C-alpha cells in the first residue's frame, strides 16, 4: 500500500524546534509535574530481581504474571521487530509516563480512538493501514504469544477470545492492539483500556541493554526481560521499568518491546455501531467486496479500568524456588523455610545469612540531587556550533526514525524518476569512493576506527555533488522553490543520519568512523562555505558543476509538474469497511517452523499449576561460613584508612549508618562453628568452607564465602562443588560493592563512591569474618561466577554490608 504523500511530507519535516527543546527550567518543571502522578521506581525500591522463568502470584494466589525466558523463536522476533521498529515514534501522548518528555512509542492493529481528535473511530491504526502489505510479518510473533498465553492462563485466554469482536482480531488471536515501545523507561502506571477479564502480554523483540526490568511496584519484584522473553501479566497492577544500567555516560543501548492486548472499547456498543455503519455503507459500493460479511455482537463483560487490588507478598530468598519453574522440585521444601523465615519474630534470616531480611537504619538512600533524572538518556544536549544542523539528542533520535524516507523505495513516490536516478547514482558514487578510501586506510592500520576526510579528494567532490542532489530532493519533497530554515535543519539532520547508517550498514564501517560530527562539518562547508572551494576550481570544473546543478533542478521541477505525486485517500479520511483485509494464512510448514501450539506446549511444560504440596519430612539446610583466617577483636577505621578517605563525603555517608557501627562493634561471626539449629521440621547445620561435608542436603547457603576466594575460577568451581551437595538450590550470600542506586547516580558521585566503597566493605568483612582484604565484587562480577542458572537476586533491605543473595539452580543451563 503506497504511503499518503501529504501525511508523509508532514512527517518528514516534523522535527522538534528550538522552542520545543525547552529551557532547563521548563524541563525540570515538566518532570516534577509528571512524577507526581507517575513516579519512577528504581531497582533499589524492590527486594527481588527475578531472572528465570516463573509464575508470580499475589498473597491470595492470583497470578500477577508468568514470565517465560527465550519463549519466542528467533525468526519470529526478528521478523516482527524489523517491521514494528518504525511504529515507535515521538509522541507527547505518553509523556506523563516518561517524566514529561515525549517517548518513542506507537500503536498498531486496531484502536478505538475514543477521546482522540481523530474523527473516524474504531478502525485500523495508521501504522497497520500504511503497512498493510508488510503487516503479515507480525503474524508469527502474535500467534506464538497467543498460544503461550493460552497454555499458561487458559481461562483468561478464553474469556478474552470470547469477548473480542472478530472484525478487530489480529490474525485470529484474542489481541486487537499492539503497543510498541523503543528505549522507553516507563514510570509507574496501569494499562487503562485493556480488557478486565483477560491478561496482557509483553515481549522484548530486540535490544542490547542491561536493567530496565519490568517492576511490579506494589510487590517489590522486578522481572528482568531480554530479547525473546515473554510475560503474560495482569496489566492493571501498577508497573514500571527500573533504570537502564549503563557502565559509562553515553553508552549505546537499544530496546524494543511490544505489548499485546485487547482494547476493550472496541467491544463496546459505540464501536459495534461504527462497524455496522461502515458495513452498510460498503454494500452501496458494488465494486467492493468486504472480507467480513457480517458483524456478530459479543458479550464484552464489565470493564471498569480500575487498578487490580493488591494482596501483598512476604518475600525472602526462599520465595524464589516457590515460583521459579526450574526449581519446582524443591518448592515445597523452600516454602517451609520461607514461612518460618517470614513469621513474626523469626531470626532464621540472621542464622542463615548473617543479618535480617531488612534493617531500618542501614546505609541511607541518596538524595535526588545526587541522582540523574530518570529519563536523562533522552535529554537534549546543548546545540552544537560545529556544523550545519543541530546535534541535540532529540533532533538526532528523531532523524533516526525518519532516515527511511531517503530510501529509494520511499522517494520513488514523491520525486521524479529522473531526480531519483540522480540521487541513486550520486549516493552510490560517494559510497563507492568512501569504501575505496576506507579499505586503503584499513590496509595501513587494521585497528583504525576513524575515517580521514581529505578535502582535495575525489570523494570530497562526490560528497558535494550528492549534497546538490540532496538539496533538490528536499525541495522536491516540499514541493516548493525554497525551504524554511527549520525545514533545512530537519532535512540535513535526516540526510546525515541516513549517510552515517549507509556507511555502517553497506560498507561495514564503525558508526564512529563516518560520524555525524564529521558529516555536519562537511555540510557546513556545502551550505555556508562551499563557494570558497568553487571559486578556486578550474573554469571547466565550475562550468560542469553549474550545468549539473541546472540539470538537477530541472529534474526536480519536472517531477513537480508531471503529476508525479498522485494523491490517494489517506488514513485520516479512510471510511471503508476494510476490517481484516490485512489478514492472510501463514504457512508454518512451508517455512519449516514449529507450529505455535506445539512450540507453546514445549516452552510451558514446566509451568506449575495449583497449590504446592506440603513437605512432610525434615528440610535440611547447610550454612557454609568462611574459614577464620584470623581473630579480629575490633577495627578502628580511623587507624585503618587514610585521612583523605575518612574525610570524603562518601565515606562519611557510609559510616553514618547506626547498623554499620553495630557491625564494627560486634563479635566476629565465624570464630567457631555454631551449633546446629532445629526449627519445626527445619534442620540447619554449619560448616567451614574448606571442610564441606559429603552428605546431601536440600539447600546450601554460602555466607560470604566467595569474598575470601579472590580467584574467579576457584570461586566459580566452589559454587559448582556446593551445588553438588544439595537437591534443591544454592544461596550465594555476598556483598555487592556497587551501591543499590549505583546506576542512577551522577558520574561524579559514582566516581567518589567507587574510590571508597571497596575499602569500606573490606573493613566490615574483616570485622565480621576475619577476612583479610576481602574480594568484594560487583553484581555483574558475582553473576559471571555462577556456572549453572541464576534464578534471582534477593537484596537484604538496608544491609550495612550491602548484602545480596543469588539463588542458583544446581543444574547446568539447557
From Swiss-Prot:
Subunit structure: Monomer. Binds to DNA as a monomer.
Record function comment: Dioxygenase that catalyzes the first step of DNA base J (beta-d-glucosyl-HOMedU) biosynthesis by converting thymine to 5-hydroxymethyluracil (HOMedU). DNA base J is a hypermodified thymidine residue found in the genome of kinetoplastid parasites, which is localized primarily to repetitive DNA, namely the telomeres, and is implicated in the regulation of antigenic variation. Also specifically binds to base J-containing DNA (J-DNA).
CC annotations in GO: nucleus
Protein name: Thymine dioxygenase JBP1
Transmembrane regions: none
Natural source organism: Leishmania infantum
Subcellular location: Nucleus
GO biological process: base J metabolic process
Cofactor annotation remark: Binds 1 Fe(2+) ion per subunit.
